């Protein structure tokens, strides 16, 4: 994998930094594992904008990724690594011994021809999935379940991982990349190793058009608007002289939004700022 800085042949190329991986499959994705992925434009079922700055972008097909990894005891061989436009991580197409093919998140170091497996008897090596009660304390894992059988929810982005720091009876304690430490049931599954494509964070889009290809629209400052459009709008000069708020008058920039008190008991230590 190489990080390539483009030559300044035009203003749009001057700042572009690409991540090039020659191991990625150059052909089409595996068609039976594709689904239609319609654009919402940030609108809900009433046609109202619920998420701003979303719209347009290149047409994409959704790759059905196996986050549950529940084919226990059946070995699989990695056929190829692929790019996935729906996530920062790359994905791997694996062929199980019974003939079924599935997409999985590609861990760091995984390559075509490698063998992986799921279940309590799987070896302790990157790419294998086990219940966390069977994984040694201190191991780094990704695609971690929060409820047994629900499928991985934690550490799925490129370059991310979770560390198992303790095991106490029916629970294991995890250290997340944010610094948060939380308890999860020991029967929850996790995949060994960290997610690959860590160089994703080094890429630079280089121009506004590259963001538009990805379906991201411009973000306009509230102070640049009129009073009818935003609480920060209008006035002579640039000061808005009040606490920063959203376009709907709700406090922003640092206000806590978490309200899930039901699972607070599982958080051992809050994330570091």
Swiss-Prot record:
<dbReference type="GO" id="GO:0016740">
    <property type="term" value="F:transferase activity"/>
</dbReference>
<dbReference type="Pfam" id="PF03947">
    <property type="entry name" value="Ribosomal_L2_C"/>
</dbReference>
<dbReference type="GO" id="GO:0005829">
    <property type="term" value="C:cytosol"/>
</dbReference>
<keyword id="KW-0689">Ribosomal protein</keyword>
<dbReference type="InterPro" id="IPR022666">
    <property type="entry name" value="Ribosomal_uL2_RNA-bd_dom"/>
</dbReference>
<dbReference type="InterPro" id="IPR008991">
    <property type="entry name" value="Translation_prot_SH3-like_sf"/>
</dbReference>
<dbReference type="GO" id="GO:0015934">
    <property type="term" value="C:large ribosomal subunit"/>
</dbReference>
<comment type="function">
    <text>One of the primary rRNA binding proteins. Required for association of the 30S and 50S subunits to form the 70S ribosome, for tRNA binding and peptide bond formation. It has been suggested to have peptidyltransferase activity; this is somewhat controversial. Makes several contacts with the 16S rRNA in the 70S ribosome.</text>
</comment>
<dbReference type="Pfam" id="PF00181">
    <property type="entry name" value="Ribosomal_L2"/>
</dbReference>
<keyword id="KW-0699">rRNA-binding</keyword>
<feature type="region of interest" description="Disordered">
    <location>
        <begin position="221"/>
        <end position="273"/>
    </location>
</feature>
<feature type="compositionally biased region" description="Low complexity">
    <location>
        <begin position="39"/>
        <end position="48"/>
    </location>
</feature>
<dbReference type="GO" id="GO:0002181">
    <property type="term" value="P:cytoplasmic translation"/>
</dbReference>
<dbReference type="GO" id="GO:0019843">
    <property type="term" value="F:rRNA binding"/>
</dbReference>
<dbReference type="GO" id="GO:0003735">
    <property type="term" value="F:structural constituent of ribosome"/>
</dbReference>
<dbReference type="InterPro" id="IPR012340">
    <property type="entry name" value="NA-bd_OB-fold"/>
</dbReference>
<protein>
    <recommendedName>
        <fullName>Large ribosomal subunit protein uL2</fullName>
    </recommendedName>
</protein>
<dbReference type="InterPro" id="IPR002171">
    <property type="entry name" value="Ribosomal_uL2"/>
</dbReference>
<keyword id="KW-0694">RNA-binding</keyword>
<dbReference type="InterPro" id="IPR022669">
    <property type="entry name" value="Ribosomal_uL2_C"/>
</dbReference>
<comment type="subunit">
    <text>Part of the 50S ribosomal subunit. Forms a bridge to the 30S subunit in the 70S ribosome.</text>
</comment>
<dbReference type="InterPro" id="IPR005880">
    <property type="entry name" value="Ribosomal_uL2_bac/org-type"/>
</dbReference>
<dbReference type="InterPro" id="IPR022671">
    <property type="entry name" value="Ribosomal_uL2_CS"/>
</dbReference>
<comment type="similarity">
    <text>Belongs to the universal ribosomal protein uL2 family.</text>
</comment>
<dbReference type="InterPro" id="IPR014722">
    <property type="entry name" value="Rib_uL2_dom2"/>
</dbReference>
<feature type="region of interest" description="Disordered">
    <location>
        <begin position="28"/>
        <end position="53"/>
    </location>
</feature>
<dbReference type="InterPro" id="IPR014726">
    <property type="entry name" value="Ribosomal_uL2_dom3"/>
</dbReference>
<keyword id="KW-0687">Ribonucleoprotein</keyword>
């Amino acid at each position: 994998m190489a990080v390539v800085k483009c030559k300044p042949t035009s203003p749009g190329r001057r700042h572009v930094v690409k991540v090039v991986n020659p191991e990625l499959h150059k052909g089409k994705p595996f068609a039976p594992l594709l689904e239609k992925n319609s654009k919402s434009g940030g609108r809900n079922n009433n046609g109202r904008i619920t998420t701003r700055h979303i719209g347009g972008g290149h047409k994409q097909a959704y790759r059905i990724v196996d986050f549950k990894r529940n084919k226990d005891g059946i070995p699989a061989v990695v056929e190829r690594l692929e790019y996935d436009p729906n996530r920062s991580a790359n994905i791997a197409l694996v062929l199980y011994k019974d003939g079924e093919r599935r997409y999985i998140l590609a861990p760091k170091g995984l390559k075509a021809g490698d063998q992986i497996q799921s279940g309590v008897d799987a070896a302790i090596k990157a790419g294998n999935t086990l219940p966390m009660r069977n994984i040694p304390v201190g191991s780094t894992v990704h695609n971690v379940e929060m409820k047994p059988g629900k499928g991985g929810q934690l550490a799925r982005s490129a370059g991310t991982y979770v560390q198992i720091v303790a095991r106490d009876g029916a629970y294991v304690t995890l250290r997340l990349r944010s610094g948060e430490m939380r308890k999860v049931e020991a029967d929850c599954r996790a995949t060994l190793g960290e997610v690959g494509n860590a160089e994703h964070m080094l890429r630079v889009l280089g121009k506004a058009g590259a963001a538009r290809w990805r379906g991201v629209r411009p973000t306009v400052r509230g102070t640049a608007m009129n009073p009818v459009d935003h609480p920060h709008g209008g006035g002579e000069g640039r000061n808005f002289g009040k606490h920063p708020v959203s376009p709907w008058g709700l406090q922003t920039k640092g206000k806590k939004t978490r309200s899930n008190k039901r699972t607070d008991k599982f958080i051992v230590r809050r994330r570091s700022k």
